[in-house]
Amino acid sequence: MKKSLLLAVLSVCLLPLWGQANLSQIDSLVRKMLPEASEVGISVYDLTAKKSLYTYHDTKLSRPASTMKLLTAVTALSRSDADNPFCTEVWYDGVIEHDTLQGNLYVVGGFDPEFDSLMMDSLIEEVITFPFSVISGQVYGDVSMKDSLYWGHGWAWDDTPEAYQPYLSPLMFCKGAVEVTVVPGSQQGDTASISCKPASSYYTMTNRTKTRTPSAGKYSLSRDWLTNGNNLTVTGNVSTFRKDLVNVYDSGSFFMHAFLERLRAKGIVVPESYGFTELPADGVEQMARWETPVQKVLNQLMKESDNLNAEAMLCRIASQATGKKHVTAEDGIV
């Protein structure tokens, strides 16, 4: 808290000092505001004159934190292709005849971190404009844009099942998380009512709550994450309305499961299950496409310090900078 206060004070105090050669007043602020045994690194750089004005422990290495999101955003925006949208596409092979797609459907992920339920519906609406109601082949997800590492470098394994640590995939749906709304019952001891968004059979729910019953224990929302399960469990005392998020395992499968569910809801006969494979290089045609403006991704990245959006932006930088079809996070850093 004191470190945050120091940064805020520095920001205000430095404003009248811009353009002055002597910034030694910062030293007294550091001594006065910084708690004993804590550390801070400061570098004041004049972008116009291209020279350093003040440094304090500026070369000391620390574990990277959310300040890296600023560097990621600046790097992404500095590119000539910065305005290119994040895309999710549906392709097909084979032919459409007699109300049947005699071929396969491919959903190609472009690591859109803002792809939500409404966007899924829009993508489905495009698909059903084609003259078929049966898919005789398979439905595949293409997640080949990035490697299979589903957490960013340095992420703590025990932060799951928090929603700020989703399982990364080029096919993200609702940020790889479920929003759980819990409403206490009318009588003490009643089981609270629970609703979830997005609704899906991909996950199950166990409700062990009690309304205004302290003996039921502290309220908790979790998931059987140690076994990579998707049974959401809500337990404990519910005294007021609550709305929380929990991640699910894994994001690519969550997307594809929801995609098939919504095709079925529109009357399309689809296979019982889905698979994952890369889109063939030849013999395919595009069926649908959703584009998310980069500004929407940046807003969430910078204003909400969104981990998912930062990783998606890093992956995008890697793809644009290297020209590779398959990238890793390291490709965006080097």
Question: Across the structure, where does each feature detected by a protein language model lie?
Answer:
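Active-site SXXK
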Residues: 50, 64-82, 139, 171, ...
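Polar, glycine-rich mid-to-C-terminal structural blocks
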Residues: 108-218
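Short, well-structured active-site flanking segments
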Residues: 78-93, 102, 272-273
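Beta-lactamase-like hydrolase cores
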Residues: 20-60, 86, 126-130
